[in-house]
């Protein structure tokens, strides 16, 4: 009876040059996404009056009446407007303040 070995011979499987794995590529893409600033988006709603939204933009963000009115009109005509940007913590705080004032606001990474 012949002797049978169950162990395979050692094969040097090291590639000649380093290779990039998909996991490394994904990490780079995620890091680039995290480098983008966050923005606060205010959405149109059927409840708040236009002059109230203008007032809130002035009070919370220090916008002039003209700038606050411009942003309010953008919300009214386009359905949304970006009203602030910055770090995630800052934008989360801005969204919280807008919610406390009764406005519909969300946050997202800046698309530009």
Swiss-Prot record:
GO biological process assignments: protein catabolic process; proteolysis
Record-linked Gene3D superfamilies: 3.30.1390.10
Assembly notes: Binds to the N-terminal domain of the chaperone ClpA.
NCBIfam families hit by this protein: PRK00033.1-1 (NF000668)
Function: Involved in the modulation of the specificity of the ClpAP-mediated ATP-dependent protein degradation.
Family (UniProt): Belongs to the ClpS family.
Protein name, per record: ATP-dependent Clp protease adapter protein ClpS
């Amino acid at each position: 009876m012949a002797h049978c070995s169950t162990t395979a011979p050692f094969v040097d499987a090291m590639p000649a040059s380093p290779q990039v794995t998909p996991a490394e590529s994904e990490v780079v893409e995620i890091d680039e996404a995290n480098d983008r600033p966050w923005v606060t988006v205010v959405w149109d709603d059927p409840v708040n009056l236009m002059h109230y939204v203008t007032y809130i933009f002035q009070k919370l963000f220090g916008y002039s009446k003209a700038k606050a009115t411009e942003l309010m009109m953008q919300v009214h005509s386009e359905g949304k407007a970006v009203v602030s940007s910055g770090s995630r913590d800052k934008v989360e705080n801005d969204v919280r303040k807008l919610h406390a004032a009764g406005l519909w606001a969300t946050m997202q990474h800046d698309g530009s």
